[in-house]
């Protein structure tokens, strides 16, 4: 019984290593070359140009160092969140923020669209993908109605070496 458990643990460990390897290979070139803040700036600029939705960027200075996997998760959640905003929200404005925590970084996307209307967010492919990315890096994802209506997507990921 113990041997089977050890073999199962080893299989899970190998699978996780493979997922991480694939994620690294899928890392956008901009993220690899310029870093997270520059990659998100470029993403926001392109999004605003294509969608016509104004993006206000707010990035804290001196963000804690993130692992490559956590940076990729933040970038992909921002990308998926912006895509959902363009498709579903009817928003005219969105705030894209990176906030420094003592041992984490938080991505916030807040729009002024129609929000959830009291409903729970649909768990479509985009939302499910965001949740899975958060879990893979030990992060936490919250999706809720924003303070002034609209929708807020919040992803907190641990800094490298934290936790």
Predicted regions span which residues?
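Coiled-coil dimerization/phosphotransfer module
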Residues: 1-163
């Amino acid at each position: 019984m113990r041997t089977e458990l050890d073999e199962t643990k080893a299989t899970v460990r190998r699978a996780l290593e493979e997922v991480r390897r694939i994620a690294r290979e899928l890392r956008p070139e901009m993220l690899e070359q310029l870093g997270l803040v520059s990659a998100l700036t470029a993403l926001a600029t392109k999004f605003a140009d294509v969608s016509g939705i104004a993006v206000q960027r707010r990035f804290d200075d001196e963000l804690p160092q993130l692992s490559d996997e956590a940076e990729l998760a933040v970038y992909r959640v921002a990308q998926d969140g912006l895509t959902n905003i363009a498709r579903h929200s009817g928003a005219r404005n969105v705030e894209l923020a990176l906030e420094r925590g003592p041992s984490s970084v938080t991505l916030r996307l807040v729009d002024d669209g129609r929000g959830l209307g009291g409903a729970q967010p649909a768990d479509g492919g985009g939302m499910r993908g965001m949740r899975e990315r958060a879990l893979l890096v030990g992060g936490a994802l919250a999706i809720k109605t924003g303070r002034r209506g609209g929708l807020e997507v919040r992803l907190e990921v641990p800094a490298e070496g934290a936790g």
